[in-house]
From Swiss-Prot:
Noted pH dependence of activity: Optimum pH is 10.0.
Species name: Escherichia coli (strain K12)
Activity control note: Activated by N-acetylglucosamine-1-P or K(+) at low UDP-ManNAc concentrations.
Binding residues annotated for UDP-N-acetyl-alpha-D-mannosaminouronate, in chain numbering: 160-161, 212, 216, 219, 250, 252, 263, 330-331, 416
Catalytic residues of the enzyme: 212 (proton donor/acceptor), 266 (nucleophile)
One MF term in the entry's GO annotations: oxidoreductase activity, acting on the CH-CH group of donors, NAD or NADP as acceptor
Protein name: UDP-N-acetyl-D-mannosamine dehydrogenase
Entry's Gene Ontology cellular component terms: cytosol
Amino acid sequence: MSFATISVIGLGYIGLPTAAAFASRQKQVIGVDINQHAVDTINRGEIHIVEPDLASVVKTAVEGGFLRASTTPVEADAWLIAVPTPFKGDHEPDMTYVESAARSIAPVLKKGALVILESTSPVGSTEKMAEWLAEMRPDLTFPQQVGEQADVNIAYCPERVLPGQVMVELIKNDRVIGGMTPVCSARASELYKIFLEGECVVTNSRTAEMCKLTENSFRDVNIAFANELSLICADQGINVWELIRLANRHPRVNILQPGPGVGGHCIAVDPWFIVAQNPQQARLIRTAREVNDHKPFWVIDQVKAAVADCLAATDKRASELKIACFGLAFKPNIDDLRESPAMEIAELIAQWHSGETLVVEPNIHQLPKKLTGLCTLAQLDEALATADVLVMLVDHSQFKVINGDNVHQQYVVDAKGVWR
């Protein structure tokens, strides 16, 4: 069965680029999202997120009649579910959005359809999704019931793209294809080859699920080493960035760069999925998460120390001091604030500091709700000219071009080493 019509559930940072990639190959693509604003924006040929090169692809696809968005699912040959999978309680995975998406498409599933889960999920989620679909559609058969002879094929195919490079990596990167059966994997591979230039690497659904969690946990553990090293160096009076540069001259050493913490909806979340399912075995993974989660509070302590030094050296009161936070996004040159340690730090500073807290974030036009009324969104020049204490949190390109020698403030907390 060919894939004449493809539907993507969830039109966020992964779903919309994926929908656009299929539409760019002149496939009929229906994007589904519960966010009416996102749907309306896309149907105008515009985008509601920041991602290089995405706007032009969406505009061309919509104008050509290959991409449209809706708030309700309609019949399609293939479905891709790319909805959030946050955690709840004690870092337990919350599969509510995946279940809701699966149950929303069940009424319009047809024999021969392919359903792919892309959302980062704990091991066994694809099988659980298949159970939800089977529960709602007893008239159809699924892989867990009849194997290769199933009416509906099910697979897990995680994305592995870098925000800011999504439109390139979506097409160029290899793709892990985890079907519930070999037939499911073959059909999923056929679907992705519509736009994929990388290789489709086939495995089973459980291994594919664990693969995505492993990739991000590996990154988290390595970042935790760098962040822990930064704490040690601060106590020892050593420039951690110089230290890492020197250590990395060793041919078999590649230490990552420290920062204010770890953010985003992948690296800051996925390791907990492994810990939740394997609490006794995942001790290193848990410790790395705790190290990275603690880093924002260490940054806050540095800010408090800088403010105390500033007050001691000037005749200003605390309420007269301005603190400027540079960056809110979880990584450079994007507008994604999910799980961002920079935003957490800005919020904590604003709650603690009696004076004005400025925020400079060149990729947004208004503050998120949790910072509205707490902080002031400022331009870069204004913050540099008026703030008493500077806090560098995200190494956006606009910040990196500023020569540290031209920063006149004596009280600087640089969590990214931009002005080192």
